[in-house]
Every structure is written in C-alpha cells, then in structure tokens.
Amino acid sequence: MTTSDHRRPRVLVSTDIGGTDPDDFQSMVHLLLYADVLDLEGLLSSPYGDGRAADIHQVIDCYERDFDQLHRHAHYPQPDALRALVKQGAIDRADHHGRTGTTEGSDWIIQRARVEDERVLDVLVWGGLDDLAQALHDAPDIADRLRVHYIGGPNTMWSVNAYSYLEAHHPTLTMIESNSTYRGFFEPDPDDPHPVDNEQFVREHVAGHGALGDFFAAQLPRVKMGDSPTLTWLLHGERTPEAPSWGGRFVPLWADRRRYFTRLTTAADQVEVNAVLEIAPPLPEGYGATDHAHLLVDGREQGPCPDGVAQAGSITFRLSVYRLGEVPYRVRSTHPGLDGLEGAFTSVPPSPEKAATPSADHPHWWTDDPDPAQAIGRALGARWVSRYRSEFLGDFAQRLRRCLPGA
C-alpha cells in the first residue's frame, strides 16, 4: 500500500482507553473532532486493565454535549451513530498462539473488512494487537484489505503474543509499526526556536472549549496524545509510509529482528529493542502438567510476566522490551528446578546498517527510521513528527474552537 490516496479514509480504532494511560482519552477527543473528514467504522475497546467500552461512551457523551456547536459544520456524525460503532474487544491478552477467542471487537473488524469498498480499511491500534490477531486467525482472507497503523513500544511488551503471531503468520500485512516515532507528538523538536509548550497549549486552547475540551484537560494538564499520530498521518501527507507527514515518516522493516535462545541468557546477549525474544531452556526433570512458571522481567511486579509454555522438552518464555540497556529477569515457578533462576540480556537499538536491507518476508511492513539524525534522545524517528507540531496542534486548536458558542 504505497500509492498516495486522498479519498476520505475508512477508519476503525482499537484502543486500551481507560487502562493504564489517560492519553487515550485525549486522542479520542482528537479523533471525534475530526469525525467530519473520516468515515468512522469502529471504536473498539481492547483494554489491558480496567478500561471498557463504557470509557469510549464517556467521550461520546461529551461530543453529544458539544454537538449543537459542531453540527454547524457539515458531516459530523450523530452521537448515536458513533455509539453504534462501539464494540467490546478482548479483555485478556492473547495466548502463546496469538488467540484470545472471538470477541465482539474482533468480529467487527472482520465485518467491516469484508464490506464491498475499494478503499482500504485503516485500523488504528492504540493498545494491544490482540483483537486484530484474533480477527486474522478467524478470517485470514481480510489481511489484504487492511492497513494497520500501530503504536508499539510498550504495547508490544504487553501484547507480544499477538504481535509475534502477526509478524510470523501474516508477513504481507500492510503495517506501520511506530515504536518511538509517535513520541514526536509531545516531544518538542530540538531545532524549533519557539516550540509549543504542552501545558500552555492545554490552558489556552483546550480548557474551556466545550465539554470535549474540558474533558481533555481533566485527563492530563498537558498534551500527550501519544496515539494521535495514527490520525494525523491520515490528515496530512500522501498516506504512504515513506513520505513525510504529520504522523511521521517510516522505513521498511528489516530482517532478523527476532532472537531465540535455548538457554537462559546473559547480559552479553544482545537483543534488538522492541523485537520478539524467546528464551527456551530445557525443562527440568519432573516438571508436570500442574506445574507453571513465569518470568519477572526488569523487576516489573505489575507485569507483564511472560508465562512459560512447556513443549518438546523445553519451556519457552516470549517477551519484548522497549527500554534500552541491561534487562535482568528471574524465573518464578512451582518447580524447584526452575524457581529462582536468573538471567539477563542487553536491549540495543537497531543499527542503520542492518536496517538498510529490507525484510524480503515483510514487503509492506514499516517502522521507525533508525537514522540518529531523526531521533529525539533515544526516540528513533521522533523528529519526523515533532517538526510539524506547530502545524498539527494549531489545526487541533482550530477544531476545538468549533465547540465554542457561535463558532
């Protein structure tokens, strides 16, 4: 999917809104204020924590309170039309095979993908990939009708099984994987002499601008909106991953990112950040059907704690990390031969040299530009977004003014 397309986009959003980060609420406000230029086809709740479809309805309630003002501008959908698009997706993370079981959300992806329409269905993933993976388990024929824009990084850490399934079993899927490019939405461009201040923007252009503006400001007193580059990529630019746009510029995915070890690793073992890692030491004698094991990674008691899957004489732990540097881990198990074992690995950035050779297996998969000149700190590719901050935030401010009386 590399040709430019300026038709009105068909958009389905999968979000972990209401879960671990309030910025999804901000991005949902952002999305609804641009609903007049999109064909919205689905709003899926795919939470890691406590978030549910009710959290999406909460934002639509604010939209309804502002609708008399928004309706002065053509093509805004009725609030009830938006409510009909809200579906509950997976509550639990995908298993080792990338499956959650069919959900209302995964089934809705299939239904919308099979609609007779020449346009691709843009699936914007603001959380885990679990519902998308389940949809492709159930209906692999829809893959070539989708264009996925995924905010990865921490989300891959949580939904590594779904990610692993898509990468391995649907390599020709059209995918934009933004592991750090998205950070340019809230990280000021180091070359901008007058960068937009995130807190000042909310005070001056968001708070007091209708129910949507007040709701946005109540979530965080500053701009974050880490999922919004998936939207702004559609609003400005050629809608081709390699072209600059408000949502970033991306490069083809390269080969050999995944690592597999048949032993516990050490800090001398290097693993590419955000890639899939599988650690598969031998099963100890006497490990039975009632035994279980998981990894405590980097001291993260809150998780995720990858479960060990026993098969073919080994026990496999699958994980992904988004932090650079040495990452320690410890095995917790009911079996004394595993419990307490420790290891580590070192998470490293991709090299521009390795990234110069695209993966032959993933012809339509794109990711962050590894060129250090386009990074902000360690956030690869972030400058491709941050250079447009004054433009897309200025445009957002104009949209927020539509919520004011008489606007």
Where are these regions (language model features)?
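N-terminal acidic, glycine/proline-rich low-complexity segments
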Residues: 1-407
